């Protein structure tokens, strides 16, 4: 009997071994060409909420099947046929503005298009008023409106030129303050559609930076008004007007003052404009209420910090309470992002949250029940959770669950929410939850039927203690397929690195490219430093007046850990673009004892060469912080360079000028250093098409030649 038992146990081991050994390997076509696998499958798509208890979902039985729209009754959990028309909020004919051949057309319901403009000049950023009666736009840097009922055009400003921009942002405001999503638009309708606010920017004193265009027999120069650290900035005025008047009321600010203005806020009734003001040093933020009739202002809020305050909040700093007199404000002044309740006159009522919250987004304010719903990173800095707090600050509850990153969609009345949740080892799932965070129904799982049938590399989130012992630095690491602890492997680290710009997130990420590199034996790493946002503003403040220093110190600590855990110290690669390119260059120079190979794209190499607003926020001006600019410059450490750096840049980059790479190349040549360099003619701060494929191929060949030390397979070519 004993012998039979031993035989049976051995038989089970053999069966288990063979079953485990029968896992399939992903083919080249699946990894590199997007050929079908059933490792994952589509989740139902949330089309929207019909009302507080009915959700519209777009579902597929399998990837090849047609979509079907269903209505989910959240109270019963039952589904019934639905249609996208159920999301329509109004029966009135829709009014859409169409741009054709640089002119504007009105498309109203099923009616033929009506031409609104016919000029040789472009109409830019057409934006309808909230009541759908007007469209505002800019033309040749002046602000216009058209009454969509009468088709009457009104020119609100008349001094637009190459230097005077009305309703159209100067470059530094577009890039650093208002944001790229605005597409240079700097005008805003009031909620009642009775007024329009705009910024007037005067670029007269802003220095010109010439960008060379190689096209044509003689080439040409594109002259950009681009302020560098210490340079004059655009002079900005805030104007307000009614949509059919050219009588502009100017807010009571002195445009010649060294200052910045952030995204303005209209009060919910449209009767006043709140303007964010900041000093040139970016350590004092004030919010003013501006009177629409005479432009007078009164101070509502005043915040000072020893380091800096971020102005580019994209409209998320202030949220008004519409049914009561007050607003909530988000600030990191106590070292973390917390939420505060204020009266409309600016006086503080109470602090709503008091904890280590970061990356907060207000989802909804429920004034009836005196609640605010928001997402934030708190339980774990690599994950996003969903919370509800009472406006009086006495109660707070986490509504999401588990060790997952959550993306939520709250019902209009706050009775239910759906969440898409995942982590680095769990594909996304979709669930319906009630207002107390209790599971109502699982709605979908992206884990496919063949998930367990394929060999896949292991990805995990780990923490490495900083050298000073103060921080547990997060890394996301994908190990080589069939990783063997007794062997040494090459490493490729992908980074960005800027202040509050972390990249390590604990969510499901699966790509054929990632699995390909793992199959080839490459350790793939994303890593964040103490100032990347995982440790609040207290951690970020380390970078004040010292860009490039703490990032490198913490990353060297992580590289030491990698060396002790399977990394080949002679093949430590790092790659990044923009700020990531800067840190790649720093790693190959100041960190040359630890980083051996680098791919640096669109890189800053000296902070004196970047723009005023971004650089001075962290570094102050070169005159105020000469030592910080010196220690933060790649050029300072070129003599330490000893690995292999591949530099690449777009010739018409209007963000990080190619001047940066040229100055680095010059210094490398002066020091007789070997490096690689590639330019992309006409490329801006990024490029597409064949240039993008060429760039990818060249970078992949660099990895094969220097890290994997073998020829790149033809299957990798794009």
Sequence positions of predicted segments:
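Bacterial Sec-dependent N-terminal signal peptides
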Residues: 1-27
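Beta-propeller domains
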Residues: 199-349
């Amino acid at each position: 009997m004993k012998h039979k038992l031993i035989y049976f146990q051995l038989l089970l081991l053999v069966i288990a071994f063979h079953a485990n050994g029968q896992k399939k390997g992903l083919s080249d076509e699946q990894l590199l060409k997007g050929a079908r696998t059933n490792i994952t499958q589509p989740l139902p798509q949330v089309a929207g909420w019909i009302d507080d208890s009915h959700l519209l979902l777009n579902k597929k039985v399998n990837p090849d099947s047609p979509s079907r729209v269903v209505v989910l009754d959240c109270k019963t959990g039952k589904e019934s046929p639905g249609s996208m028309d159920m999301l329509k909020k109004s029966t009135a004919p829709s009014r859409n503005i169409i741009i054709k051949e640089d002119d504007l057309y009105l498309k109203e319901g099923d009616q033929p298009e009506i031409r609104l403009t016919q000029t040789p000049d472009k109409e830019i950023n057409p934006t309808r008023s909230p009541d759908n009666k007007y469209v505002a736009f800019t033309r040749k840097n002046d602000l216009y409106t058209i009454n969509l009922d009468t088709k009457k055009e009104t020119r609100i400003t008349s001094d637009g030129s190459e230097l005077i921009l009305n309703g159209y942002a100067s470059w530094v405001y577009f890039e650093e303050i208002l944001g790229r999503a605005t597409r240079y638009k700097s005008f805003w309708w009031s909620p009642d559609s009775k007024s329009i606010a705009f910024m007037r920017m005067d670029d007269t004193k802003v220095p010109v930076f010439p960008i060379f265009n190689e096209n044509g027999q003689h080439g040409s120069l594109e002259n950009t008004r681009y302020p560098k650290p210490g340079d004059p900035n655009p002079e900005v005025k805030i104007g307000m007007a009614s949509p059919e008047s050219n009588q502009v009321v100017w807010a009571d600010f002195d445009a010649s003052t060294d200052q910045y203005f952030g995204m303005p806020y209209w009060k919910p009734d449209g009767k006043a404009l709140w303007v964010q003001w900041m000093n040139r040093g970016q350590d004092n933020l004030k919010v003013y209420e501006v009177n629409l009739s005479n432009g007078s202002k009164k101070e509502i809020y005043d915040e000072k910090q020893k380091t800096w305050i971020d102005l580019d909040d994209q409209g998320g700093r202030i949220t008004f309470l519409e049914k009561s007199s007050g607003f909530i404000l988000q600030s990191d002044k106590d070292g973390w992002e917390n939420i505060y309740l204020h009266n409309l006159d600016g006086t503080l009522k109470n602090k709503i949250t008091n904890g280590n919250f970061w990356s907060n987004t207000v989802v909804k304010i429920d004034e009836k029940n005196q609640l605010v719903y928001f997402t934030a990173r708190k339980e774990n800095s690599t994950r996003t959770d969903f919370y509800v707090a009472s406006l009086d600050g006495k109660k707070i509850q986490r509504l999401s669950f588990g060790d997952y990153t959550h993306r939520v969609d709250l019902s209009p009345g706050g009775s239910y929410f759906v969440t898409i949740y995942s982590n680095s080892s769990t594909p996304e799932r979709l669930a319906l939850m009630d207002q107390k965070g209790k599971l109502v129904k699982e709605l979908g799982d992206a884990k496919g039927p063949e998930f367990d049938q394929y060999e896949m590399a292991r990805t995990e989130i780990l923490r490495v203690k900083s050298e000073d012992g103060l921080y547990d630095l997060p890394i996301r690491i994908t190990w080589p397929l069939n990783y063997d602890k007794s062997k040494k492997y090459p490493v490729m680290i992908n980074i960005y690195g800027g202040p509050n710009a972390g990249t390590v997130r604990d969510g499901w990420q699966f790509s054929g490219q990632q699995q390909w590199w793992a199959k080839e034996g490459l350790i793939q790493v994303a890593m964040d430093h103490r100032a990347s946002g995982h440790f609040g503003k207290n951690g970020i403040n380390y970078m004040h007046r010292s860009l490039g220093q703490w990032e490198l110190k913490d990353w060297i600590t992580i590289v030491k850990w990698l060396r002790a855990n399977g990394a080949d110290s002679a093949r430590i690669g790092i790659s990044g673009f923009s700020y990531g390119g800067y840190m790649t260059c720093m790693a190959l120079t100041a960190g040359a004892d630890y980083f051996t190979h680098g791919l640096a794209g669109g890189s800053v190499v000296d902070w004196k060469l970047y723009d005023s607003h971004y650089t001075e926020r962290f570094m102050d001006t070169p005159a105020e912080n000469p030592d910080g600019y010196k220690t933060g410059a790649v050029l300072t450490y070129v003599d330490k360079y000893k690995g292999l750096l591949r530099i690449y840049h777009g010739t018409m980059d209007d963000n990080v000028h190619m001047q940066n790479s040229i100055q680095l190349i010059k210094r490398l040549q002066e020091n007789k250093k070997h490096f690689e360099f590639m330019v992309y003619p006409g490329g801006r701060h990024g490029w597409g098409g064949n240039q993008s494929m060429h760039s990818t191929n060249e970078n992949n060949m660099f990895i094969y030649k220097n890290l994997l030390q073998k020829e790149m397979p033809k299957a990798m070519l794009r």
